[in-house]
């Protein structure tokens, strides 16, 4: 393996790890193995700390391919709690409001999910890395400032209801770059005339890369020590 010339690695991001931590951890062990102090390493799409799943990491000259990977279709499995919202639309924040769910049936959920297939306009979460006048939205939101983000045009290719244990549902989503599943959960809750937030998220596929092809970052040190790695002079 030649990490300087460029390699593409697939990781299964663990729960609680930031995407930045996965990259830093991988870089540290590559540099250790190559006996170098620095190496260009980047990832092709952030996953929130509370999400797990496929993360593509590029090294050396392969970092030029990051944009190519970012445009690949992504597949997620999301667990959504109906009847309650949080400021971040996930478990990062406490519940801030509750809503009725008695009127929600499996049939209503399935009918509502169909309305999200195709091109949709989605307002990103205030707690996101989107920029507002040069500042990150989450920095402004954490300071208690009102954050107004413009809707983005996205494509949802598929939504499938996997489990329906009301007021909790589990869905599979195939979508385009830039889709916030947290925001999708929010919008599904509103469309059901209730509220909703994300309680679990797994990115199961990016392009053709599936979860079962991915390395566990916690075992990366052991894995890289068994590889034939090109050592820099």
Swiss-Prot record:
Catalytic activity: uridine(55) in tRNA = pseudouridine(55) in tRNA
Residues spanning the signal sequence: none
InterPro entries recorded: PsdUridine_synth_cat_dom_sf (IPR020103), PsdUridine_synth_N (IPR002501), tRNA_psdUridine_synth_TruB (IPR014780), TruB_C (IPR032819)
GO process terms (BP): mRNA pseudouridine synthesis; tRNA pseudouridine synthesis
UniProt keyword list: Isomerase, tRNA processing
Keyword tRNA processing: yes
NCBIfam families (alphabetical): TruB
Family per similarity comment: Belongs to the pseudouridine synthase TruB family. Type 1 subfamily.
Protein role: Responsible for synthesis of pseudouridine from uracil-55 in the psi GC loop of transfer RNAs.
Protein name: tRNA pseudouridine synthase B
Protein's organism: Bacteroides fragilis (strain ATCC 25285 / DSM 2151 / CCUG 4856 / JCM 11019 / LMG 10263 / NCTC 9343 / Onslow / VPI 2553 / EN-2)
Lineage: Bacteria, Pseudomonadati, Bacteroidota, Bacteroidia, Bacteroidales
């Amino acid at each position: 393996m030649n990490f300087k010339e460029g390699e593409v690695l697939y990781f299964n991001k663990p729960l609680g790890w930031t995407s930045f931590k996965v990259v830093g951890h991988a870089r540290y062990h590559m540099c250790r193995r190559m006996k170098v102090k620095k190496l260009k390493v980047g990832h092709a799409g952030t996953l929130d700390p509370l999400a797990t799943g496929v993360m593509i990491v590029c090294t050396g000259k392969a970092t030029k391919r990051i944009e190519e990977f970012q445009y690949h279709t992504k597949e997620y499995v999301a667990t959504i709690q109906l009847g309650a919202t949080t400021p971040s639309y996930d478990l990062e924040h406490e519940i801030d409001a509750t809503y009725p769910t008695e009127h929600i049936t499996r049939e209503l959920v399935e009918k509502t999910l169909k309305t999200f297939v195709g091109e949709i306009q989605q307002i990103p979460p205030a707690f996101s890395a989107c920029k507002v006048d040069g500042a990150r939205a989450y920095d402004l939101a954490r300071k208690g400032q009102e954050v107004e983000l413009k809707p983005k045009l996205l494509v949802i290719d598929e939504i499938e209801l996997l489990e329906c244990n009301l007021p909790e549902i589990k869905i599979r989503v195939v979508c385009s770059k830039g889709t916030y599943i947290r925001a999708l959960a929010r919008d599904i809750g509103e469309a059901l005339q209730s509220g909703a937030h994300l309680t679990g998220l797994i990115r199961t596929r990016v392009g053709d890369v599936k979860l079962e092809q991915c390395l566990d970052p916690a075992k990366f040190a052991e894995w890289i020590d068994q590889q034939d790695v090109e050592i820099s002079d």
